[in-house]
Regions:
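Metal-dependent phosphohydrolase cores
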Residues: 6-211
């Protein structure tokens, strides 16, 4: 009799644990969904302000695919990218590898085999994707930093990262120039510059005017 009771209690404990795990998983999935949707909303608003309507509408849609969403939910923390947590556990992020090959606003997308060196090297990003990258980085800082966000947050993140060694030198120079403008002159002037100058193909200050 006591054996049956103990067995029932153990089974009850297992059911309770399973229920709690399922509840936690569902909650993380919901929180992850809200986070990536909030991020998309900020990017979309920024893109719309500079005239990149299609890019704003389609930004990061692959994050809702099973390959990215379920891994993102599993490693969701709320204060940083789930890709970082997945990378810490496994040594790499499957979600990120899926994502970077489908989204042109990431500089990692822009790599190809160089004929001279026979090595994969970075390629300078087209300007419309450079601008979307600016919106992406700004939005990520807004979402993850919350009240601690400042116009200089994206530049600070860039300066702390190893990206400077991986990004095409000209793309890095352009990105840093824009992020410094965002920090020093604010959104209104920076967005106007992106719309009226960068996306119009006008030269950056260090470039020569086309003859």
């Amino acid at each position: 009799m006591s054996t049956n009771i103990n067995s029932s209690l153990r089974n009850g404990d297992k059911c309770g644990i399973i229920t709690k795990l399922r509840s936690v998983t569902e909650m993380k999935a919901w929180q992850h969904f809200k986070t990536i949707t909030q991020h998309r909303w900020h990017v979309m608003k920024g893109c719309f302000r500079v005239g990149l309507y299609w890019q704003g509408l389609t930004h990061d849609l692959s994050k809702y695919s099973p390959s990215e969403f379920f891994r993102g939910a599993r490693y969701y923390q709320g204060t940083r990218s789930p890709n970082t947590a997945e990378r810490e556990e496994k040594g790499y992020s499957e979600a990120w590898m899926h994502h970077k090959g489908r989204n042109k606003h990431h500089y990692e997308y822009w790599t190809d085999l160089c004929r001279e060196t026979r090595r994969y090297e970075s390629v300078e990003m087209p300007r419309k994707y450079l601008v979307e990258m600016v919106m992406d980085r700004r939005a990520a800082c807004i979402v993850y930093q919350g009240e601690n966000y400042t116009p200089g947050s994206a530049l600070e993140y860039l300066d702390r990262s190893i990206e400077q060694n991986l990004m095409h030198p000209e793309t890095l120079r352009q990105l840093r120039y824009i992020l410094k403008m965002l920090r020093d002159r604010g959104e209104e002037k920076t967005f106007r510059y992106l719309k009226k100058s960068v996306l119009k193909g006008k030269p950056f200050p260090w470039e020569k005017e086309p003859s």
